[in-house]
Amino acid sequence: MAACRAQPPTSEQAWLEAAQTFIQETLCPAGKEVDKELTRSVIACVKETWLSQGENQDLTLPFSYSFVSVQSLKTHQRLPCCSHLSWSQSAYQAWTRGGRPGDGVLPREQLILLGTLVDLLGDSEQECRSGSLYVRDNTGTLDCELIDLDLSWLGHLFLFPSWSYLPSAKRNSLGEGHLELWGTPVPVFPLTVSPGPLIPIPVLYPEKASHLLRYRKKSSIKEINLAGKLVHLSALIITQNKRYFIMTLGELAQAGSQVSIIVQIPAQMVWHRVLRPGRAYVLTKLQVTKTRIHLSCIWTTIPSSTLKPLRPGYVQELELDLEFSKADLKPPPQPTSSKDSRGQEGLVRASKVLHYLGTVTAVLHESAGLYILDGQLILCLAYQKIHGLRRVIRPGVCLELRDVHLLQAVGGATTKPVLALCLHGTVRLQGFSCLKPLTLPSSKVYGASLYEQLVWKCQLGLPLYLWAAKTLEDLIYKLCPHVLRCHQFLKQPSPGKPSLGLQLLAPSWDVLIPPGSPMRHAYSEILEEPHNCPLQKYTPLQTPYSFPTMLALAEEGQHRAWATFDPKAMLPLPEASHLTSCQLNRHLAWSWVCLPSCVFQPAQVLLGVLVASSRKGCLELRDLRGSLPCIPLTESSQPLIDPNLVGCLVRVEKFQLVVEREVRSSFPSWEEMGMARFIQKKQARVYVQFYLADALILPVPRPTFGSEPSQTASSCPEGPHLGQSRLFLLSHKEALMKRNFCLLPGDSSQPAKPTLSFHVSGTWLCGTQRKEGSGWSPPESLAVESKDQKVFLIFLGSSVRWFPFLYPNQVYRLVASGPSQTPVFETEGSAGTSRRPLELADCGSCLTVQEEWTLELGSSQDIPNVLEVPRTLPESSLAQLLGDNSPDSLVSFSAEILSRILCEPPLALRRMKPGNAGAIKTGVKLTVALEMDDCEYPPHLDIYIEDPQLPPQIGLLPGARVHFSQLEKRISRSNIVYCCFRSSTSVQVLSFPPETKASAPLPHIYLAELLQGDRPPFQATTSCHIVYVLSLQILWVCAHCTSICPQGKCSRRDPSCPSQRAVSQANIRLLVEDGTAEATVICRNHLVARALGLSPSEWSSILEHARGPGRVALQFTGLGGQTESASKTHEPLTLLLRTLCTSPFVLRPVKLSFALERRPTDISPREPSRLQQFQCGELPLLTRVNPRLRLVCLSLQEPELPNPPQASAASS
């Protein structure tokens, strides 16, 4: 505070001279001579106040104190302080003990403050008075707060013995501090006491004034004086045009004896600080006026009206020359509330109205008007426009609340009861705080106008308002300050420019706000009986939704994914019990969980800034706590191709949170699947998928994250002021992967290592264009018009961020900023030319995209004489895919992913040195169903992703539709067509997996239909008859090495086989026919029991008997033929199985669901028909017979028996 005042003088004479100088400069009217009487009065007042301590009798003047002006406080005092001239040191210490331990108490400064107490900010009487109080001297005016005010104090010079000064809590705001005036100010000159009236004032009391108002037409009285006890005082109403308040005189117990007066004269707004409910007053010169809303009449003051305390002998009741009947004297009937509960009587609760006196213990949110009282109650002042008082409220302040609403269990993450004031109630300051103001974050200081709009324009009820305030605070925690500044997020809305905070909350308010909610009317809220306001009734709120951070959402997704990870549930027992250890662990190695947004309670809303990552080459939604990869799609199955959306704020309510789980396990067999110790490692990859139609995209008014500054340049609507650009049509994009690049000259010191990069090939559509204002100049003429304009672009380093936006058959604009005079896009034979000679053989130029270059979505319409670019995706024909004429060609197609499993890496990688084993990645096998317009039953195809340099691909999930471009087609040694990812491959997700997918039933066909047409169904159902059994085999094999296990012990006898487990495996081959054709069907494992007609317990018993020999095999030569058995034929189990296989229990009609053993991708030559002789009586018949179909059993059921005919009624 040293800067606020000079050092106090050391002698009495010097102190008096400094005081005289201060009084002359600060308190004397400008332009007048020295007022010695004023100087003597001020010093005498200071001396009297100083000596009132009782501890300073040895010093008659406060030499340690110095005078301070208003301007000095506003200019130099940057920290809160207090001064107590009349307090002793012990009194100050006792006062400071009122603060809680750890809280900062206001430091004491030795300052003397004098000034005139006024209710007018300026010097002109024409200025509007708002009811605020000020301390004024010659240097300026300062806002102040006073607990008790007497109207006679206004305009007089006072010494303020105890006060505190608090600068503004907002940064960079000078002169917005305020004074808190403790105790009663001491007048420098004695105040003149106004004598009572010479004759008593004729007055009406409330009961007769109320009757007169109702029957005013019967009386000629136009102006009255009113006396009575103040029973109710409304809040000070602040509108755009004026301020006013309403006071009610009368008796609380008698509703008909009350009368209301509206005070709306600006000079009388200060009355609101003086009036105290329970005291009696006299108001003079009242007239009748009509309210704007209800057009009802009410008494009102005029500029010459006065307010006086009611004292005995000052008034005399006025006798009216009116005669009232008994019916007239009855109070008017009270209207009943017409508020409709809309059928929710069981949910709607009523608040309680009460008076409360409490101490503020915490500030929840200053801008939202939320505080904590006595550590137990939430105080909400948002439903009153209280501006001046809010700056005073801090821990330690004592408040009196009258006619306040008590709401309990409001919900919306609020557990404490809430006290809320409507316009009918008042809040009055009862005591200041000795504590310094808390240093609040910007989120709780800015945005008062936004929170007012939530109440007054959006008409939010209290439960919803509390939730909205908490949600806005969470959003600031997510986005500020690196995404945008707090004051930008909470800025006051303007026409055409809604607040960003409101835009994020508003999309769901149509559901949350009840339809037909009435608008607030101040007159109705204050005057209507019974009382009706937004706080009168409320419905407890279930938290509608929340905005989790990206980190919290990813952690929640992983938690749910691993909580549902159950190996036994993933592999049901009938299937798992027959798998070897290798098969078992491979099935568990990869799985995924899709969590739609509807499964979260409360609902989760995705909110983040769209960022293109240069480290991963994918799109991310990012906030201050983390980021999540994302895949946005349009409704037309098109990806996001506009780079201008980078840096925008994305809000999504409907999305899919995908968690891919990878597990490294070593379960010996299915029996140990419940033991967690066999899981060595597990990891998850989390990302989100959503459609742009379900997203709200908002531009952010400033750059987003400083870690990747270059990517926000394209999102700037103005664009660079200087630069050049060129349009190109993209024809193909290669895979994003780590590639080797030659070192540039001078970089030999850096070791070469693979770099994440990708390449695109395309065609220049025109020459270079220069920046002209906000657009581009016409394209420059080409040096050689006939030259091929094909181009090869290399993206590496920071330019990898453009990978998610580049897709074939799209037009893009490559922009290079800066005043470069050299056309950078015409450069040929760049450093990348020698790196990829094969790819560049057909390209006229090669460019490495620089990190500072940006990408924009272009259009071929920008260039004249250029045909519209087709948007269809390249598709290979079915003949190209499944033909054997081009075994190593590149193919493109769209398909639906049916399954995805992890597979072993290629043999070349498995032969790597043990030291590099950590770098080996397992491959991925996708089984897809091709989408072909001319194919009724889409064939299935396997796709392998085995390149270790390829980063993990997101979005390749079962059920998703994907377009694969330039896969390498291969043919296996068994003539099966499959495809592999290569560096030239690119992937485009067309649609996400459906949240609920109903499996379509298999078609029911005749077997002969499988022999007709080129593309029969791969899977189907048929009704057939088992003719005979061809073979049956039951094995017990080692779960680790698959060797035969007689007596349950591995026959390999190799120390390298650690397994002590054996699993059973069985298969049976059947001959079936349905009258149109015959087929051999193989059934495996648990389906063997169904084929043999055995119950689970009977099948388990047979398996246990087969455990001893380890292998039981039966081979049947034909119908009626002998059995060829690898087992001993005299053994009981063999005899049982041989008898069973030839019995009618097996040879029966069944309903068979099957898959073709010959896959649609099998291009091996089909087996030709053969000649076969049949005996028909005595005549031999020779005919050509088609080869038997080979089927794999999927399920086997007993045929449905026809319903028996209804028995006819017996004749009488």
From Swiss-Prot:
Assembly and binders: Component of the CST complex, composed of TEN1/C17orf106, CTC1/C17orf68 and STN1; in the complex interacts directly with STN1. Interacts with ACD and POT1.
PANTHER family given in the database record: CST COMPLEX SUBUNIT CTC1
Similarity remark: Belongs to the CTC1 family.
Function, as annotated: Component of the CST complex proposed to act as a specialized replication factor promoting DNA replication under conditions of replication stress or natural replication barriers such as the telomere duplex. The CST complex binds single-stranded DNA with high affinity in a sequence-independent manner, while isolated subunits bind DNA with low affinity by themselves. Initially the CST complex has been proposed to protect telomeres from DNA degradation. However, the CST complex has been shown to be involved in several aspects of telomere replication.
InterPro entries: CTC1, CTC1-like
TM segment ranges: none
Pfam families: CTC1
Organism of provenance: Mus musculus (Mouse)
Gene Ontology biological-process entries: bone marrow development; chromosome organization; DNA damage response; hematopoietic stem cell proliferation; multicellular organism growth; negative regulation of telomere maintenance via telomerase; positive regulation of DNA replication; positive regulation of fibroblast proliferation
A cellular component term, taken from the record's GO annotations: CST complex
Protein localization: Nucleus; Chromosome, Telomere
Keywords from the named record: Chromosome, DNA-binding, Nucleus, Telomere
Example GO molecular function: single-stranded DNA binding
Protein name: CST complex subunit CTC1
